[in-house]
């Protein structure tokens, strides 16, 4: 997989999960290894040593001198921002010396290419977006499994892609389909990755400190597409639709959109409402005698279809709550259909999927008030999606480390849906200033527990108390899961006080 390079020397930068996976993979293939981390003793160093991987370890600041001694490939961990001055200087030096700089995704793409020479030709599906990646990735994996395929789910979702591939090789159980969740960090170093189909779910402000600008962040997301990839795009998101080919372009026929309105183009997906029922639908050519003819006509572009809305299933048959999750379901269905999986088992699987923890998860209903854990909502876009998706009166709990985001997109959904907003954490004042114009009652609380109890007092039957912070958690908690645990404990206390059970 390393071309003409024989036992190349690889410099791995960063010893997180991906860095360790790169080191394992390279050691497996006989590479000489130098591993560098800004920490003198990163946690995974012990694992590296315990596994007997022969590598030179260098702790401390990155410098171009790390390239000396014959380095041929740099393996870059996704957590390291290429804008950080020391790393930027090292990458510039690598480029000057024509040293390849790969992330784990590029190693994975090269590995699949090498395996392809032995006849292994799996389908590869990839998902990115600011929000909804994990839900859509797991759902897509389930859909493929229920269609009878052997499936591997990996990437940002964990396990690392290279670790999962190594395990599949060792077990002689290579999957038919790879379903990959990919972050902008992982895509930043993509070079030859070309999945069969890939979806961008949405693009809103996030990780701007890492990428430097929104445009750079969006551009990284766009690297998910190869030259022949079927593009699955959210037509409700203008930033996503910038990746749609121009009408009449050669690859326009390989573009599928999904959204929360009725689809107008053949092969697209959306929602159709009839007598108060929302249906997941596909736009089909009414005149096409079969699906093969329909696809051929779309590819040729010579036929103007008479569009009809083919009902797939009622949206409320999904077990995952919210309109944003209906959109995620449409994206997963579109990806699976893009590799020609039959519709019937996919629709059964859509009804089966129960969702992910801490992602608009209803954890209790007390006195007809839903308590919803969306602690994974660590950016503004996620909270907007949760508010609009639940589409009911809400007492919102928000705040934490805002990561320099603009909170203005919260104004409209808060004004529409919120009975009140409870604010916590470092950036509560910034959120308060932004939401003041809504006229919605705002209250500051020193702890999440206090915010939950106050929200419970304000909520009325039929409402939801929603923890969707729009912020990272590290100013008050170990991580978003710890924040969710504190929320759940407070809800349990409320249930006990009211004589209910959760």
From Swiss-Prot:
Pathway: Cell wall biogenesis; peptidoglycan biosynthesis. It is an enzyme of class 6 (ligase). GO terms for biological process: cell division; cell wall organization; peptidoglycan biosynthetic process; regulation of cell shape. Keywords: ATP-binding, Cell cycle, Cell division, Cell shape, Cell wall biogenesis/degradation, Cytoplasm, Ligase, Nucleotide-binding, Peptidoglycan synthesis. GO terms for molecular function: ATP binding; UDP-N-acetylmuramoylalanine-D-glutamate ligase activity. It is found in: Cytoplasm. InterPro entries: Mur-like_cat_sf (IPR036565), Mur_ligase_C (IPR004101), Mur_ligase_C_dom_sf (IPR036615), Mur_ligase_cen (IPR013221), MurD (IPR005762). It catalyses: UDP-N-acetyl-alpha-D-muramoyl-L-alanine + D-glutamate + ATP = UDP-N-acetyl-alpha-D-muramoyl-L-alanyl-D-glutamate + ADP + phosphate + H(+). Its EC number is 6.3.2.9. Pfam families: Mur_ligase_C, Mur_ligase_M, MurD-like_N. Residues 288-307 are annotated as: Disordered. The keyword Nucleotide-binding applies. PANTHER family: UDP-N-ACETYLMURAMOYLALANINE--D-GLUTAMATE LIGASE (PTHR43692:SF1). NCBIfam families: murD. Cell wall formation. Catalyzes the addition of glutamate to the nucleotide precursor UDP-N-acetylmuramoyl-L-alanine (UMA). This is UDP-N-acetylmuramoylalanine--D-glutamate ligase. It comes from Burkholderia ambifaria (strain ATCC BAA-244 / DSM 16087 / CCUG 44356 / LMG 19182 / AMMD) (Burkholderia cepacia (strain AMMD)). The gene is murD.
């Amino acid at each position: 997989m390393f071309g003409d390079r024989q036992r190349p020397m690889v410099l791995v930068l960063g010893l997180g999960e991906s860095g360790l996976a790169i080191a394992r993979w390279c050691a497996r293939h006989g590479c000489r290894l130098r591993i560098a981390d800004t920490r003198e003793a990163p946690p995974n160093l012990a694992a590296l040593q315990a596994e007997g991987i022969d590598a030179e370890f260098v702790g401390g600041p990155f410098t171009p001198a790390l390239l000396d001694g014959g380095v041929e490939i740099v393996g870059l961990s996704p957590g390291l921002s290429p804008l950080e001055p020391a790393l930027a200087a090292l990458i510039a030096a690598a480029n000057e010396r024509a040293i390849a700089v790969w992330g784990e995704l590029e190693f994975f793409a090269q590995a699949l290419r090498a395996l392809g020479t032995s006849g292994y030709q799996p389908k590869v599906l990839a998902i990115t977006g600011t929000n909804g990646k994990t839900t859509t990735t797991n759902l897509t994996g389930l859909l493929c499994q229920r269609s009878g395929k052997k499936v591997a789910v990996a990437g940002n979702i964990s396990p690392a892609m290279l670790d999962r591939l190594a395990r599949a090789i060792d077990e002689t159980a290579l999957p038919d389909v790879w379903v990959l969740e990919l972050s902008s960090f992982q895509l930043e170093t993509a070079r030859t990755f070309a999945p069969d189909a890939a979806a961008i779910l949405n693009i809103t402000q996030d990780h701007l400190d890492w990428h430097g600008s929104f445009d750079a962040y969006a551009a990284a997301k766009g690297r998910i597409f190869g030259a022949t990839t079927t593009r699955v795009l959210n037509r409700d998101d203008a930033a996503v639709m910038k990746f749609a080919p121009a009408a009449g372009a050669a690859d326009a026929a390989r573009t599928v959109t999904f959204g929360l309105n009725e689809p107008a183009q053949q092969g697209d997906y959306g929602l159709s409402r009839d007598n108060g029922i929302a249906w997941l639908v596909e736009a089909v050519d009414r005149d096409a005698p079969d699906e093969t003819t329909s696809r051929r006509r779309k590819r040729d572009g010579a036929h103007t279809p008479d569009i009809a809305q083919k009902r797939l299933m009622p949206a409320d048959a999904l077990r995952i709550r919210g309109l944003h999750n209906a959109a995620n379901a449409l994206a997963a269905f579109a990806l699976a259909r893009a590799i020609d999986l039959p519709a019937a088992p996919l629709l059964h699987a859509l009804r089966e999927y129960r969702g992910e923890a801490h992602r608009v998860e209803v954890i209790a209903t007390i006195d007809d008030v839903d308590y919803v854990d969306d602690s994974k909502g660590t950016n503004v876009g996620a909270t907007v999606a949760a508010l609009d998706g639940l589409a009911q009166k809400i007492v919102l709990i928000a705040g934490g480390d805002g990561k320099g985001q603009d909170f203005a997109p919260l104004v409209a959904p808060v004004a529409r849906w919120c009975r009140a907003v409870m604010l916590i954490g470092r950036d509560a004042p910034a959120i308060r200033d932004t939401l003041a114009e809504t006229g919605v009652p705002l209250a500051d609380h020193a702890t999440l527990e206090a915010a939950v109890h106050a929200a419970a007092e304000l909520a009325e039957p039929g409402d939801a108390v929603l923890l969707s912070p729009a912020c990272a958690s590290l100013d008050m908690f170990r991580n978003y899961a710890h924040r969710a645990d504190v929320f759940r404990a407070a809800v349990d206390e409320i249930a006990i006080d009211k004589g209910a059970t959760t």
